[in-house]
């Protein structure tokens, strides 16, 4: 018989109970459901991490022989459980003079053999890519400006990614007036960075991922309110997700061809900053009247999307961006908004989101919205001043910069990244 439990988690569910086994050993019972998904296992692991951390426990051994028959059928149970612990253990404390020690030693005994440390498993590369994304998003704007960001991406060459950085001189030569216009008020440079992973030697079209990388967004002369402006370091989260994805693919030696493209800028106020009413010429040749300098992300993505399509001729393009506050009004922080011109791609993205509990909701695209973005002075304007459909008109704007209609395009517009702090486990992909 087990001794009387000395502690349990405060939750009514009582997922964990600790028993004293000996002066230096304790047994922890973990409650699980009958038919747990991989995400359920990760959530259990995340909750377990919080539990053992609060009880100051740092060394664990999982015994495969003690796993219930229900869970032993899932051969990945322990790996998924520990992955949830690892995701939840993330902490950005780089700039704290006193750091809380959170290291935990986790072992596993398979078939009563010697304990094996869980270090390199099938989730290791995913964890590295995820944490790299989180590190990028967490850096303050004075540290991770476009110049520094481009340098950090270049470091990924050592894991096999083919990387090219286009600086302002290159972008001017290419004619990327939309992207350059956003960054012209900053003393920092503006860049377009491409990352290629060729894991499949066939000549299959690559999968393309494009990310918005506004390292800090003041709103420009369409200035944002002072309150919460510090959160605008998160306006590069879409690009960070793309960079983390490309790192994961390279570490996994994934058998696919993929390309990641990110536009890196700072949207600042200065004597050289873009003015409301300016007209810029995009890489596509289409002109844009900039009525609002705080609708800048779509200008960065416009050039990045056209460039990605023309240069890489991908099977599809998915862009990730913290593009509009309007999507939060529509969906809150539980769902990311999905806009797509391809039903099959949409179904795949929605299904993937459900599986990892990072849910997407498909929003409408329709040619009737185009008239809201038409300009009297240019081919289009960058904002809808009529009111309403803010996220849809932003996506409709971006769709104009896909030249060939055969390219499937998906836009994932995410809520404020700060919302991830309340998640049961920290998300693996930040939108």
Question: Predicted regions: what is each one?
Answer:
Residues 81, 418-421:
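Helix-centric, low-specificity signal for extended rod-like, repetitive segments
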């Amino acid at each position: 018989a087990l001794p009387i439990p000395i502690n349990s988690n405060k939750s009514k569910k009582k997922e964990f109970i600790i028993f004293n086994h000996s002066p230096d050993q304790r047994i922890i019972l973990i409650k699980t459901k009958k038919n747990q998904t991989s995400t359920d296992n990760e959530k259990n692991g995340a909750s377990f991490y919080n539990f053992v951390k609060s009880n100051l426990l740092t060394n664990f051994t999982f015994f495969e022989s003690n796993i219930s028959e229900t869970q032993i059928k899932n051969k990945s149970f322990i790996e998924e459980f520990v992955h949830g612990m690892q995701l939840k253990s993330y902490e950005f404390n780089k700039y704290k003079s006193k750091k809380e020690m959170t290291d935990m030693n986790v072992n596993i005994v398979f078939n009563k053999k010697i304990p094996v440390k869980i270090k390199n498993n099938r989730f290791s590369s995913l964890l590295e890519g995820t944490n790299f994304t989180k590190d990028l998003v967490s850096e303050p704007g004075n540290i991770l400006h476009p110049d520094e960001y481009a340098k950090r991406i270049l470091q990924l060459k050592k894991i096999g990614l083919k990387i090219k950085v286009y600086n302002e001189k290159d972008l001017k030569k290419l004619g990327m007036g939309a992207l350059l216009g956003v960054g012209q008020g900053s003393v920092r440079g503006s860049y377009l960075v491409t990352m290629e992973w060729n894991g499949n030697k066939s000549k299959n079209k690559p999968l393309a991922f494009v990310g918005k990388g506004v390292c800090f967004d003041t709103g420009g002369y369409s200035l944002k309110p002072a309150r919460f402006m510090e959160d605008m370091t998160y306006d590069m989260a879409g690009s960070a997700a793309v960079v983390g994805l490309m790192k994961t693919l390279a570490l996994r030696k994934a058998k696919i061809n993929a390309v990641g493209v990110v536009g890196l800028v700072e949207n600042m106020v200065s004597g050289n900053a873009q003015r409301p009413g300016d007209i810029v010429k995009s890489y596509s040749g289409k002109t844009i009247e900039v009525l609002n300098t705080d609708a800048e992300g779509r200008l960065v993505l416009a050039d990045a999307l056209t460039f990605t399509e023309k240069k890489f001729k991908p099977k599809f393009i998915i862009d990730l961006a913290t593009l509009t506050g309007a999507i939060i009004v529509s969906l809150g922080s539980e769902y990311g908004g999905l806009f797509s011109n391809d039903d099959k791609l949409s179904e795949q993205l929605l299904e993937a989101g459900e599986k990892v509990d990072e849910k997407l909701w498909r929003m409408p695209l329709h040619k009737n919205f185009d008239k809201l973005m038409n300009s009297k002075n240019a081919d289009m304007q960058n904002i809808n001043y009529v009111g309403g459909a803010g996220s849809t008109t932003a996506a409709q704007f971006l769709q104009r910069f896909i030249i060939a209609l055969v390219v499937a395009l998906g836009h994932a517009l995410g809520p404020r990244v700060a919302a991830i702090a309340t998640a049961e486990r920290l998300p693996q992909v930040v939108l």
